[in-house]
Amino acid sequence: MAGNFWQSSHHQQWILDKQDLIRERQHDLKTLSEEEYQKLFMFFANIIQVLGEQLKLRQQVIATATVYFKRFYARNSLKCIDPLLLAPTCILLSSKVEEFGVISNSRLITTCQTVIKNKFSYAYQQEFPYRTNHILECEFYLLENLDCCLIVYQPYRPLLQLMQDIGQEEQLLTLTWRLINDSLRTDVSLLYPPYQIAIGCLQIACVILQKELKSWFAELNVDMDKVQEIARAIVNLFELWKGYDEKKEIQALLEKMPKPKPHPQR
């Protein structure tokens, strides 16, 4: 995973243009507002996070699964595959790619059933409807849509390198790490290289903790306009969170969301 980002498929194929991203979403944005669309993706990122934690996965594995999820819908409408099926499929694939070890299919399904029942019953009245065969079929479509570009570079490694330069700042590291996790609920992982995301999150953390590192930031060889765009996207996420009660709103959003056509009954 420590290979060259600039020569990777992540850089060459999966740093997308914002206008292309908006254009690809037009079908879904006929039904949903941009804010509703983002709220749905925040919700499914939460599902991936909780599933990953229940399965005791590293944050890197959870983050990669979330990026797979976002990449799929960057090229496809929500009606192509139910996000509730794609979320655990992304976890399964990510755990293989990140060499975490194989999650047994039965354990994955059982965890999905438990998590939906115990943690997300405010969104789903029914139990988790999918079985192993659905997830394996979905994995095939996911691989196809990702063009088998499975190596995802995350901002965590560049953050650790930046922190070595700054010096021992445990509080700053912890907060920036959390902000990187939060950034997965925005589009920044689709639009910017991971080192820029790390710097954008570090900048916000410095403001929150009132750390004076302006001269250090000024010496970085980085496009600060891009860094500001990333910081703005994360601040906008916090603004959205303030007025958003997921437990009250999500059922109506899921009802409104474009859905796959059911298979004809045989």
Swiss-Prot record:
Protein name: Cyclin-C
Record note on quaternary structure: Component of the Cdk8 module of the Mediator complex.
Function statement: Component of the Mediator complex, a coactivator involved in regulated gene transcription of nearly all RNA polymerase II-dependent genes. Mediator functions as a bridge to convey information from gene-specific regulatory proteins to the basal RNA polymerase II transcription machinery. Mediator is recruited to promoters by direct interactions with regulatory proteins and serves as a scaffold for the assembly of a functional preinitiation complex with RNA polymerase II and the general transcription factors.
GO cellular component: mediator complex; nucleus
SMART domains from the UniProt entry: CYCLIN
One of the Pfam families matching this protein, by short name: Cyclin_N
Main localization of the protein described in the UniProt heading: nucleus
MF terms (GO), sorted A to Z: cyclin-dependent protein serine/threonine kinase regulator activity
Domain of life from the UniProt record: Eukaryota
